Amino acid sequence: MTERALDSTRVYDGRIIAVRVDTVALPNGGRAVREVVEHRPAAVVVPIDSDGNVVLVRQYRYPVGKTLLEAPAGIIEEDETPETGAQRELQEEIGFRARALRYLGGFWSTPGFCDERMHVFLATDLEPSRLEPDADENIAVERFSVSEIQQMIQNGEIEDAKTVAALLMAI
C-alpha cells in the first residue's frame, strides 16, 4: 500500500514551512499528485504545577482569526532534541522549566498533506526559569484543574487539536 515518488518540485521555501508537489506511482499502477507541506518536528508540553493544575497559554492565531487555549508548544530547532525543545518552549511561553519531563509519545499533526511530527511531554516539578518569548508571540498563561480541562475538552472550549491530543495523553 505504499506510494513511490516519481517526481518532486519544491514550490515554496519559507521560514516555517516548505511546500513541494510530488507525482507518485500508486499501488494499482496509476499516478497521482501529492501536495506536501514540510514542517520541522514540534514539541508539545503538558505542564502540571505543584497544585496539580494544568498550565496552558492563550494566544491569538492569525490563520483561524481567533484566540485559542493551547499547551505550550513549538518547533524543535535543528540543534535540539525533542526534550531540549520542550524545555525551551516551557521557558519561553510560561516562564518555567521542568525538573521532571516525561515523553508520552508522538503523532502526525495532519498526515494527509503535512509531515509534521508532534512529540508530547508531561512536565512536572516546575521551577521558575524565564527565557525571552518569541518577538511575535503575545501569550497569556492560565491554570486549570484536571476536571476543568476534561470539561473544556468535552464542551469544545479547547479547539486546538495538538492540545486536545496532548491533554488526553497526559491526564
Where are the regions that the model predicts?
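Short clusters of small/polar residues that mark proteolytic maturation junctions
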Residues: 21, 35-36, 59, 108, ...
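Conserved Nudix-box catalytic region and its N-terminal flanking loop in Nudix hydrolases
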Residues: 2, 34-39, 43-88, 135
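Acidic, metal-coordinating catalytic segment for phosphate/diphosphate chemistry
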Residues: 9-44, 50
